[in-house]
Swiss-Prot record:
Name of the featured protein: NADP-specific glutamate dehydrogenase
Keywords: NADP, Oxidoreductase
The organism of origin for this protein: Emericella nidulans (strain FGSC A4 / ATCC 38163 / CBS 112.46 / NRRL 194 / M139) (Aspergillus nidulans)
InterPro entries noted in UniProt: Aminoacid_DH-like_N_sf, Glu/Leu/Phe/Val/Trp_DH, Glu/Leu/Phe/Val/Trp_DH_C, Glu/Leu/Phe/Val/Trp_DH_dimer, Glu/Leu/Phe/Val_DH_AS, Glu_DH, Glu_Leu_Phe_Val_DH, NAD(P)-bd_dom_sf
Gene this chain is encoded by: gdhA
UniProt entry tagged with the keyword Protease: no
Length: 459
């Protein structure tokens, strides 16, 4: 009987990686990598601390703060901070574990980590959020630094919270350094950072489409279902529209907003209204009944979009949270004509859904759904965070065109690396598309494993 705590989210992430390595020829060709897997699955350091702060009534409030410093073989620990009541050590270990390999796939010098708190920003005043961030950073600042650990935003941590956190770090440490990414543009932030994850997942899928069609097709004319309505979903939607596609759904934790007419699409103006709503920390349901939305969209409470979209659609981009596509929903996506699914969120698909997608890919040469895991498809966000770190180190700021061009190059490399690695270690049958989940897992893992071996972390 194990004396380790039950950590379902982390165990799911570990088993997903381990099973893809086992089902490839990697361990046959390199049996020593089994030892590396054992070592890399244990965090280098886990920091847990209390956060005591004062609400607007002058009452003491207590939350738990965490930072999982998982692996630093490739560079400083790098990964977001999440403020949400669901946060626990299992979720942060899963996110940090995924982050190791995602960061490796970018080709930049970044290790993997993740942190956060079970604090819920919803319903809190600006003053309460500022006081919480100040208390949180008062403890976290002892464990981070530009060359040690560089956190960023995540769910519940927007540019505003990053500003509060950065200000407290600067006051306590008396240092201005690139200790956080996602900063404001006038104080060390990078252009394209808010857009990066959403843009990146669309750039990645564009390469998938071009590979399958021999360069004959793109997003133009394709219907795209997106879940979520935060940064990732908003900017993915805007990029899809820019490239000629139609966005047919967005969602939040309370329900989904879906176009009524098969020929309709969200417009940039409607997405801007949704962005304003999210800044005000309100729900999509408040827009659904407004005159601008009621005639064009259906709002379905307590439902995800995947089984509620009218007609056929070609692309699905889960961009809300983990495990948001079930096995049953995966079957429905296939029946709805989806050819490409890429995770804008981390571990957006359950293992049951991934198994269904991969089985369909193997069984249907030339006409299969093709699944891209989050560690590759949504690496654009952390890639531009890495570019922000580079700009901070050089005390330079690049133009949005420079950053976007680098982002496109990184996403192309992520796609090609996963594709070529899959062809090498999990050679598909004739006409079958390579497994991007296998290729991405192996490519990220082997890069980290080799760096750890060179540095004496395993032998």
């Amino acid at each position: 009987m194990s004396n380790l705590p039950v950590e379902p989210e982390f165990e799911q992430a570990y088993k997903e990686l381990a099973s893809t390595l086992e089902n490839s020829t990697l361990f046959e060709q390199h049996p020593e990598y089994r030892r590396a897997l054992q070592v890399v699955s244990v965090p280098e350091r886990v920091i847990q601390f209390r956060v005591v702060w004062e609400n607007d009534k002058g009452e003491v409030q207590i939350n738990r703060g965490y930072r999982v410093q998982f692996n630093s073989a490739l560079g400083p620990y790098k990964g977001g901070l999440r403020f949400h009541p669901s946060v626990n050590l299992s979720i942060l270990k899963f996110l940090g574990f995924e982050q190791i390999f995602k960061n490796a796939l970018t080709g930049l010098n970044m290790g993997g980590g993740k942190g956060g708190s079970d604090f819920d920003p919803k319903g809190k005043s600006d003053s309460e959020i500022r006081r919480f961030c100040t208390a949180f950073m008062t403890e976290l600042c002892k464990h981070i630094g530009a060359d040690t650990d560089v956190p960023a935003g995540d769910i519940g941590v927007t540019g505003r919270e990053v500003g509060f956190l950065f200000g407290q770090y600067r006051r306590i440490r008396n240092q201005w350094e690139g200790v956080l990414t996602g900063k404001g543009g006038s104080w060390g932030g990078s252009l394209i950072r808010p857009e990066a994850t959403g843009y990146g997942v669309v750039y990645y899928v564009e390469h998938m489409i071009k590979h399958v069609t021999g360069g004959k097709e793109s997003f133009a004319g394709k219907r795209v279902a997106i879940s979520g309505s935060g940064n990732v979903a908003q900017y993915a939607a805007l990029k899809v529209i820019e490239l000629g596609g139609s966005v047919v759904s967005l969602s939040d934790s309370k329900g989904s907003l879906i176009v009524k007419d098969e020929s309709a699409s969200f417009t940039p103006e409607e997405i801007a209204l949704i962005a304003d709503l999210k800044v005000a920390r309100k729900q999509l349901s408040e827009l659904a009944t407004s005159s601008a939305f009621a005639g064009k969209f259906t709002y379905i409470p307590d439902a995800r979009p995947w089984t509620n979209i009218p007609g056929k659609f070609e692309v699905a981009l889960p961009s809300a949270t983990q495990n948001e596509v079930s096995g049953e929903e995966a079957e429905h996506l296939i029946k709805s004509g989806v050819r490409y699914i890429a995770e804008g969120s981390n571990m957006g698909c359950t293992q049951a859904a991934i198994d269904i997608f991969e089985a369909h890919r193997n069984a249907n040469p030339g006409d299969a759904i093709w699944y891209a895991p989050g560690k590759a498809a949504n690496a654009g966000g952390v890639a531009v965070s890495g570019l922000e770190m580079a700009q901070n180190s050089a005390r330079l700021s690049w133009t949005s065109e420079e950053v976007d061009a680098r982002l496109k190059g990184i996403m192309e490399d992520c796609f090609k690396n996963g594709l070529e690695t899959a062809q090498k270690f999990a050679t598909p049958a004739k006409g079958v598309l390579p497994s991007l989940v296998t290729g991405s897992n192996i490519a990220g893992f082997t890069k980290v494993a080799e760096a750890m071996k060179d540095q004496g972390d395993w032998w």
